[in-house]
Amino acid sequence: DYEHGVIGDLPNFPSFRGGVALGPYLESVFGIPVYVNNDGNLFAYGEALAGALPRVNKALEDAGCKRRYKNLIGITLGTGFGCGVVIDKVLLKGDNDCGGDVWCMRNGMYPFVIAEESVSIRAVRRVYAEMSHEEIGDLTPKDIGDIANGTRPGNMKAAQESFRQLGQVTAATLVNVLNIVDGIVVIGGGLTGNAKWILPGIMEEFARLAGTFSGNLLPTLQSEVYNFEDPEQRAAFLEDKDVYVDVPHTDKKVLYQAQRKVAVLVSELGASKAINLGAYNFAINQIEK
């Protein structure tokens, strides 16, 4: 319960049960206002105000493109699968403080398992162990990334596949979110050091088609997704394909955005800085209410 600063029955905080009034307690200790939110939300908020969203809009401006973006989905890939949504500078809270939660959504590869089981540090380790048939030991995602890059001994294909699968399930989850929010996607968190192995799985899944009973194939996203980290795709994303069309029975013309498109990019701020910026701005907004 972020509004009242109370931590409830969270699966990853077993010591907090029955409601712990953390915010009010810290206020009483330090004598200053205290506000509570989660890292996924604050990461997205920081990126929307001072990171990915301004970066994309500045690139569009520099390219002479008239389009601007107002909505952002921020995801953090690390110990778990975090997500936050910002719509026109407003952080999506939800009526139950669950706005943007995706970790417990259905897994795109294993429908009876939650998404986070394939989008987390433990997922990378599990897939590598399964595919390499090696004892995982204390290998970290950094180690597995080094194996994927060929700078550490190990099963390179298994290492690369462990990150590709993470990207695939990430995108399978985000397809539904993107169809509702319709904005830029920014990725952050500890696993993004291996983004070059994660992004192919994301883009592959975003391009997946779904059928109808009559046999037609349709894209699962209404907008085309571009990998902003790829120079060719970034250039295509920044290309202005908007046109002016005639207003019937008048001499007027109106702008028509002929192409629906969104972009996926990796955080330049980094998760820690984005979260700090998000937390600062969130607190300022709460104080000014």
Report residues per predicted region.
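Short beta-strand scaffold segments in enzyme catalytic cores
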Residues: 1, 74-76, 81-86
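Short beta-strand-loop/turn "lid" adjacent to the catalytic site in phosphate-handling enzymes
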Residues: 1-19, 33-35, 47, 77, ...
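ATP-binding/phosphotransfer module of carbohydrate and carboxylate kinases, centering on a glycine-rich
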Residues: 2-4, 24, 28-32, 59-66, ...
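Active-site nucleophile and cofactor-binding loops and adjacent substrate-binding regions
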Residues: 12-17, 35-43, 74-77, 266-274
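A short acidic/small-residue loop/turn micro-motif
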Residues: 15, 98-101
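Anion-binding (especially nucleotide phosphate/pyrophosphate-binding) glycine-rich loop
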Residues: 18-32, 40, 55
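Conserved phosphate-binding catalytic cores of ATP/NTP-utilizing and phosphoryl-transfer enzymes
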Residues: 34-72
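Short beta-strand-to-turn element immediately C-terminal to the catalytic PLP-Schiff-base lysine
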Residues: 47, 84-88, 92-94, 107
